[in-house]
């Protein structure tokens, strides 16, 4: 006799409905004819997408620290303090070489400082400037990407300090070169947290 026939017989014989409900709950899902429910539940339990289980690809990044040279020029170093070159970036002839084409955030900071003017001296303005330049096969010359200028008039009130920070996003090509040009190098305040230059892929 089928399951439905047995239940009908029990009901005819006066079996309480509560007992029948308990009997149904006690039966396995397959015996209740509800196997489809079990399979539906299994289908909804999807695993997490693969992209959430794996780490992203590490992108190119570089951070350089400035230091003075005997030629009164600003040189960049990648092997000291908190400086680094990662995932394809390289430093050649004081220029950063772009490893792959794409969008990059390029940034640089310089800090200038100086003493106050002597009471007998005639104050003269000091011109300060810092520029990040691009040299590419598409252009026969250095193209300014970031540029900042300031003029300082030393007074009698004491030492002075001026800082310049610049940063923006650029579309660069593999093999492009990033370099800097600075006016007022003799007034640069060299420290890892004051004079730096870098870029990272987005």
From Swiss-Prot:
Gene Ontology CC: extracellular space; plasma membrane
Residue stretches making up the THD domain: 60-202
GO BP: any one term: inflammatory response
GO MF annotations, alphabetized: cytokine activity; tumor necrosis factor receptor binding
Similarity field: Belongs to the tumor necrosis factor family.
Name under which the protein is recorded: Lymphotoxin-alpha
Record organism: Mus musculus (Mouse)
Coiled-coil residues: none
Compartment list: Secreted; Membrane
Purpose of the protein: Cytokine that in its homotrimeric form binds to TNFRSF1A/TNFR1, TNFRSF1B/TNFBR and TNFRSF14/HVEM. In its heterotrimeric form with LTB binds to TNFRSF3/LTBR. Lymphotoxin is produced by lymphocytes and is cytotoxic for a wide range of tumor cells in vitro and in vivo.
Glycosylation sites: 93
Major localisation: secreted
Name of the coding gene: Lta
Membrane-spanning parts: none
CDD domains cross-referenced by the UniProt entry: TNF
Quaternary structure annotation from Swiss-Prot or TrEMBL: Homotrimer, and heterotrimer of either two LTB and one LTA subunits or (less prevalent) two LTA and one LTB subunits. Interacts with TNFRSF14.
Keywords: Cytokine, Glycoprotein, Membrane, Secreted, Signal
Stretch forming the signal peptide: 1-33
Pfam family, one: TNF
SUPFAM superfamilies in UniProt: TNF-like (SSF49842)
């Amino acid at each position: 006799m089928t399951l439905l026939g047995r239940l009908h017989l029990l009901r005819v014989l006066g079996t309480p409905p509560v007992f029948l409900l308990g009997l149904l709950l006690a039966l396995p899902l397959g015996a209740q004819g509800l196997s489809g429910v079990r399979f539906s539940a299994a289908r909804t339990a999807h695993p997490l997408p693969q992209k959430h289980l794996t780490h992203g690809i590490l992108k190119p990044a570089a951070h350089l620290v400035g230091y003075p040279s005997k030629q009164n020029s600003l040189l960049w170093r990648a092997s000291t303090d908190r400086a680094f070159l990662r995932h394809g970036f390289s430093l050649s002839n004081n220029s950063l070489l772009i490893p792959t084409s794409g969008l990059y955030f390029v940034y640089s900071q310089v800090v200038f400082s100086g003493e106050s003017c002597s009471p007998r001296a005639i104050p003269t303005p000091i011109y300060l400037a810092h520029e990040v330049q691009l040299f590419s096969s598409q252009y026969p010359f250095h193209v300014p990407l970031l540029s900042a200028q300031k003029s300082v008039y030393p007074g009698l009130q004491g030492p002075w300090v001026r800082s310049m920070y610049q940063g923006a996003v650029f579309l660069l090509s593999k093999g492009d070169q990033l370099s800097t040009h600075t006016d007022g190098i003799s007034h640069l305040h060299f420290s890892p947290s004051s004079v730096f230059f870098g870029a990272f892929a987005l």
